[in-house]
């Protein structure tokens, strides 16, 4: 969620007010408010784990889960939408669990993050391919075919399609470059960028569903206002 916070603050700074000074102030206030809210969690982690972790110690794991040799080899050369499972995944889990046995959470997070970054540096082309595949999965109309029945996927796609169309219309509306819509758009962009690199599936969209709903609803409202203007002009 830090990426959402950063993008939201930047959007508020850039588009929150016609005055650059007011926009900068509002963006700073947004950051300060977030720090105040998250401080108890960071303090708890500092006491329990020995370090002021502001979000989670799971980040290194999810980055490594999406960027390792076994994943690249097993998924990237299979048909689109392939789900990572089987011997390669099990072997990776076993290796990681053995190597990190007895290691504290913060150190394990650091090691896995560094391992993932080394893999991406070693295989940049595959890293880009994997990022594009995750982007597609993050914004997929329906969940993975390998996991869910066709009937479930059809129902989800029928529900999601009009929302996505409304979201696109909302993003194209010129008023989206104003607060609070710009902040919502910033949050969407922030989480999308994160999950191009970290492990993802459709449920990872959950934190930005309110932002998606706001922009999708604004498209309908904008259409109604334009229609009313045409009738009265």
Which role fits each region the language model picked out?
Residues 1-8, 161, 193-194, 200-221:
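Hydrophobic/aromatic-rich transmembrane helices and adjacent perimembrane loops
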Residues 2-35, 220-222, 226:
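Perimembrane helix-loop-helix junctions
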Residues 3-4, 21, 25-33, 125, ...:
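Alpha-helical transmembrane segments of integral membrane proteins
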Residues 38-59:
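Hydrophobic alpha-helical transmembrane segments in integral membrane proteins
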Residues 39-43, 144, 170-174, 187-202:
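Transmembrane-helix signature of polytopic, lipid-linked glycan biosynthesis machinery
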Residues 53-133:
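Membrane-proximal stem/loop segments at transmembrane-domain junctions that anchor or position
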Residues 111-114, 118-184, 194:
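Membrane-interface anchor segments at the N-terminal boundary of transmembrane helices
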Residues 177, 216-233:
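A juxtamembrane structural motif centered on a specific transmembrane helix
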């Amino acid at each position: 969620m830090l990426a959402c916070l950063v993008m939201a603050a930047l959007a508020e700074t850039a588009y929150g007010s016609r005055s650059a000074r007011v926009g900068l102030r509002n963006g700073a206030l947004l950051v300060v408010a977030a720090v105040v809210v998250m401080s108890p969690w960071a303090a708890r982690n500092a006491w329990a784990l020995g370090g002021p972790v502001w979000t989670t110690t799971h980040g290194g794991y999810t980055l490594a889960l999406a960027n390792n040799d076994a994943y690249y080899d097993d998924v990237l050369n299979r048909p689109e939408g392939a789900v990572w499972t089987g011997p390669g995944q099990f072997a990776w889990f076993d290796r990681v669990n053995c190597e990190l046995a007895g290691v504290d959470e913060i150190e394990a997070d650091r090691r896995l993050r560094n391992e993932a970054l080394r893999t991406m540096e070693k295989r940049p082309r595959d890293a880009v391919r994997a990022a594009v595949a995750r982007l597609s999965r993050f914004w997929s109309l329906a969940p993975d075919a390998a996991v869910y029945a066709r009937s479930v996927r059809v129902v989800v796609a029928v529900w999601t399609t009009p929302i996505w169309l409304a979201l696109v219309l909302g993003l194209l509306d010129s008023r989206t470059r104003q607060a609070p819509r710009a902040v919502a758009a910033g949050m969407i962009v922030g989480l999308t960028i994160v999950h191009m690199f970290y492990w993802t599936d459709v449920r990872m969209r959950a934190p930005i569903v309110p932002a998606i709903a706001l922009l999708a609803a604004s498209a309908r409202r904008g259409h109604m206002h334009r229609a009313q203007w045409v009738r009265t002009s």
